[in-house]
Amino acid sequence: MERAIFAGGCFWCMVQPFEEQAGILSVRSGYTGGHLPNPSYEQVCAKTTGHTEAVEIIFDPEEISYKELVELYWVQTDPTDAFGQFEDRGDNYRPVIYYTTERQKEIAEQSKANLQASGRFDQPIVTTIEPAEPFYLAEDYHQGFYKKNPKRYAQSSAIRHQFLEENWS
């Protein structure tokens, strides 16, 4: 099994696309990239800890490759927006691919270069690629949020879905 960590704005919106793929064992919401051990949601939202909201994915590389996960990541995000994603603004919502191995770093960097060269976006691809740091699980009520709170999830992801439809379909 391998581990991947992606930050793409609100973690509520990043779970379902990965969870629906064959070869995914788990997708958990949490916080990473900051300086405070085991932060709370309130602390991260206060924008003082340096953490991003992220998802940790445990996957079977025999069924789905890291490259496929990175490609799926791109189409869930606006890779030209370094200051948050869609409705969610601020450093804690910045887009980041966190790599856990040098091979993951190489795959992510090549994928980013390919996306930039594709001309799909007029602006530069600003998603950062950074080494993985400790991942702290978010509170239980955040786990599987789209299943537990479908109406609130739909409301909180409307602008994201519109962007994805217009730019990735």
Curated annotation (Swiss-Prot):
Keywords: Oxidoreductase. InterPro entries: Met_Sox_Rdtase_MsrA_dom (IPR002569), Met_Sox_Rdtase_MsrA_sf (IPR036509). It catalyses: L-methionyl-[protein] + [thioredoxin]-disulfide + H2O = L-methionyl-(S)-S-oxide-[protein] + [thioredoxin]-dithiol; [thioredoxin]-disulfide + L-methionine + H2O = L-methionine (S)-S-oxide + [thioredoxin]-dithiol. GO terms for biological process: protein modification process. The active site is at residue 10. It is an enzyme of class 1 (oxidoreductase). Its EC number is 1.8.4.11. GO terms for molecular function: L-methionine:thioredoxin-disulfide S-oxidoreductase activity; peptide-methionine (S)-S-oxide reductase activity. The keyword ATP-binding does not apply. Pfam families: PMSR. Belongs to the MsrA Met sulfoxide reductase family. PANTHER family: PEPTIDE METHIONINE SULFOXIDE REDUCTASE, PEPTIDE METHIONINE SULFOXIDE REDUCTASE MSRA 2. Has an important function as a repair enzyme for proteins that have been inactivated by oxidation. Catalyzes the reversible oxidation-reduction of methionine sulfoxide in proteins to methionine. This is Peptide methionine sulfoxide reductase MsrA. It comes from Streptococcus pyogenes serotype M3 (strain ATCC BAA-595 / MGAS315).
